[in-house]
Amino acid sequence: MKQVVCIVAGLMVFAVCAAAQAPAAGQKVGLATSLQNAYATLKGNLTQAAEKMPEANYAFKPAPDPDLRTYGQWIGHQADNQFTNCATLKGVPSPSPAQGNEKKVTKAELVKALADAFAFCDGAMSALTDQNALQLIKQGEGETARGGVVSALLSHGLESYGIAVVYMRAKGVAPPAAAPAAGRGGPAGRRGQ
């Protein structure tokens, strides 16, 4: 029980920090809604980042290090990760072969792979409730809380988005979350991202 409380507390902190806006006075936002809001923000930012980067920059990586991924490989890697985590959430095999999307090279293929991954995840995320977030589900050879898998999906996605931002800025492309938009930290948008 202590572990479940710690997991829930950690997820609540993560979800609240990841949400784009604080709730209005008197509004109560539960765990599932917080995670769903964070997912929607991640989906918007990553989708826009994939669409906004010019095709010529999909082969870009900031150094010749063979261990670094190109921009396109990061987009494919994120799609692969989403398929894996959302297959776990749904209790089904991943419809995408391991690292299959990371091997794609054209912008069109990678944008589609990311869109397909989000479409696959959308149902799992909309089915999330405060109650089932605590349920243990099969992951690998063991079990973990459904909310823990969602947390892994979000944290990996936020990491991938952060990396994409660095690549975009290196190529002179303003990342999505830096643009002024309603609900993004006010009329000036979120600066410094």
Where are these regions (language model features)?
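Acidic/histidine-rich alpha-helical segments that form the ligand environment
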Residues: 102-138, 144-160
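Short, contiguous alpha-helical
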Residues: 36, 40-47, 58-99, 138-183, ...
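Bacterial N-terminal signal peptides
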Residues: 6-17
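Disordered, low-complexity segments in secreted/periplasmic proteins that are enriched in proline
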Residues: 21-27, 102, 179-193
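Positively charged n-region of N-terminal signal peptides that target proteins for export
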Residues: 1-4
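Acidic/histidine-rich, surface-exposed loop or edge segments in extracytoplasmic proteins
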Residues: 22-29, 89-103
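Short N-terminal segments immediately surrounding and downstream of signal-peptide cleavage
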Residues: 22-44
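Surface-exposed helix-capping loop/turn segments at secondary-structure junctions
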Residues: 51-59, 124-134, 169-175
